[in-house]
Swiss-Prot record:
Coiled coil: none
Entry keywords, A to Z: Ribonucleoprotein, Ribosomal protein
CDD domains, sorted: Ribosomal_L29_HIP
Gene3D superfamilies from the UniProt entry: 6.10.140.1970
Record flagged with keyword Lyase: no
Cited SUPFAM superfamilies: Ribosomal protein L29 (L29p)
Name of the protein in its database record: Large ribosomal subunit protein uL29
Species this protein is from: Photorhabdus laumondii subsp. laumondii (strain DSM 15139 / CIP 105565 / TT01)
Amino acid sequence: MKAQELREKSVEELKTELLNLLREQFNLRMQAASGQLQQSHLLKQVRHNIARVKTLLTEKAGA
């Protein structure tokens, strides 16, 4: 997910996206804990995407 794509979204869409990413992160962590996660790089990608969304929400709140 690119930052430019996220910038075009509204605050409500960003909040929905954040919720989806947090759920995905939870599922990936559970898979990693049980040894089922083959692609461990997905955890890092999701974490970075969560940071991007949170940053944009903060920017939009201040604007």
